[in-house]
């Protein structure tokens, strides 16, 4: 199999969440607001911290380890057809508890929902969007070439949502069921 898309497998599993609902309700009674999203992010961070082999990537046939746990997510600033979307990349150590992850996730979403706020990913995307198409193709190919050679500047890696351990997005607010997304052939996201 030459590409990631050749090797992907789709799988659906229904999991009973009665105990999880009870836990979320109990914490709500204590004044702590948890969501399914916070629980899923916490579980993923814990899983990656306990199974570091899941935080590896392959570039040019060489297996490498990430220097931290990063989870990217898309945030719709306004729930309308014209609403602007932003992407953020959250860093984790793997030592955070569910409440710390919940706070980080909630504050990041609130901060990035404001149309006045721009993060590093937004700034990079803005620069690229102002570039003529012929130059954009050259820049993207140059970025991928530098990335493949391990020469991409750290500032671009830090701004890139695709240099991440996982990319998770909550689509519940859109009123749709879970989706299966293609794998990215570029960069280092799985």
Positions of PLM-derived features:
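C-terminal catalytic/motor cores of large multi-domain enzyme assemblies
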Residues: 1-190
């Amino acid at each position: 199999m030459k590409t990631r898309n050749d090797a992907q497998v789709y799988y659906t599993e229904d999991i009973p969440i009665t105990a999880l609902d009870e836990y979320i309700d109990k914490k709500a009674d204590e004044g702590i607001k948890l969501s399914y999203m916070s629980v899923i992010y916490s579980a993923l961070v814990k899983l990656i911290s306990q199974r570091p082999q899941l935080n590896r990537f392959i570039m040019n046939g060489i297996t490498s380890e990430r220097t931290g746990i990063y989870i990217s997510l898309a945030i719709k600033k306004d729930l309308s057809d014209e609403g602007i979307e932003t992407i953020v990349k959250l860093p984790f150590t793997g030592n955070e508890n569910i409440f710390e992850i919940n706070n980080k996730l909630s504050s990041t979403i609130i901060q990035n929902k404001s149309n006045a706020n721009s993060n590093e990913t937004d700034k990079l995307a803005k620069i690229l969007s102002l570039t003529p198409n012929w130059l954009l193709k050259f820049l993207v190919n140059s970025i991928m070439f530098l990335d493949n050679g391990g020469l991409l500047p750290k500032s671009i890696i830090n701004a890139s949502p695709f240099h991440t351990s996982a990319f998770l997005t909550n689509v519940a607010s859109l009123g749709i069921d879970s989706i299966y997304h293609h794998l990215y052939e570029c960069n280092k996201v799985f």
